[in-house]
């Protein structure tokens, strides 16, 4: 942060760290630059020797001011389950069971009277003390890209022509929700990974950004660009406090 002026840090499997350590990291980085962004995966890959109450997991992020976590409820509700490649999500017509998790992401994982927290996919509580503690996303380096996921889950005679409007709806929900929107590089132009969900083991031919897609899918690219401009222009999409959201 001092030598290279890095302005953000992401923690893989942040749940293996303890709350006290994460808060200390936040404290020390804030001395250098209080705008440095800290976020991570609010879960574990396996069991941990840490007592459950001390783990820096999603449901404890309210105890870690200035630290954010990925909102996986939002991801799987909007685009379909990560654990079932053929499952559709809210944007592709599978509204049942996904309505509340979508609303949960829209309010930035905060407490809101219009969200039924019993209807969430993975979380059970409104864990974010402020919307800035929830990172809403629909794709990351792990798992399928949006377009790969849609090609697996959207079927039927009109499947191919439905992909673009579904992709647009996914990004509309993402970029108009409260919280911090996270966009994997290339999603704005339908970048795929040739159907590979774990591309860490794949060559550059799979992981590289294919810039020819920007021209091929210029309509989606411009649409996402305009959504970003809309979000930046209107404070209503960036309400900083949970109380402000409830009002």
Regions found by a protein language model. Give the residues of each.
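Acyl/amide activation-and-transfer machinery of modular secondary-metabolite enzymes
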Residues: 200-210
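Catalytic cores of secreted or luminal carbohydrate-active enzymes
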Residues: 212-241
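Alpha-helical structural signal in soluble globular domains
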Residues: 3, 20-32
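Active-site rim elements
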Residues: 10-13, 124, 154-164, 210-218
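Active-site groove signature of glycoside hydrolases
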Residues: 1-17
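Conserved alpha/beta catalytic core and glycan-binding cleft of carbohydrate-active enzymes
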Residues: 26-28, 35-185, 189-192, 200, ...
């Amino acid at each position: 942060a001092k030598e290279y002026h890095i302005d953000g840090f992401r923690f893989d499997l942040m749940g293996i760290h303890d709350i006290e350590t994460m808060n200390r990291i936040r404290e020390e980085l804030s001395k250098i630059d209080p705008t440095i962004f800290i976020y991570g995966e609010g879960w574990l890959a396996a069991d941990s020797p840490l007592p459950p109450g001390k783990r820096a997991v999603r449901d404890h992020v309210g105890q870690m001011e200035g630290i954010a976590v990925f909102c996986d409820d939002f991801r799987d509700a909007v685009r379909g389950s990560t654990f079932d490649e053929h499952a559709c999500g809210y944007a592709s017509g599978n509204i049942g069971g996904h309505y509340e998790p979508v609303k949960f992401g829209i309010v930035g994982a905060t407490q809101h009277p219009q969200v039924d927290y019993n209807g969430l996919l993975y979380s059970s509580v409104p864990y974010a003390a402020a919307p800035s503690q929830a990172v809403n996303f629909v794709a990351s380096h792990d798992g399928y890209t949006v377009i790969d996921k849609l090609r697996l889950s959207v079927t039927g005679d009109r499947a191919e022509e439905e992909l673009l409007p579904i992709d647009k709806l996914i990004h509309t929900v993402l970029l108009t929700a409260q919280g911090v929107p996270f966009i994997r590089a290339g999603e704005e132009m339908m970048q795929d990974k040739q159907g590979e969900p774990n591309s860490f083991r794949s060559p550059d031919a799979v992981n590289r950004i294919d810039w020819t897609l920007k021209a091929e899918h210029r309509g989606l690219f411009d649409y996402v660009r305009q959504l970003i401009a809309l979000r930046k222009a209107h404070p209503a999409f960036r309400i900083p406090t949970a109380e402000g959201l409830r009002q």
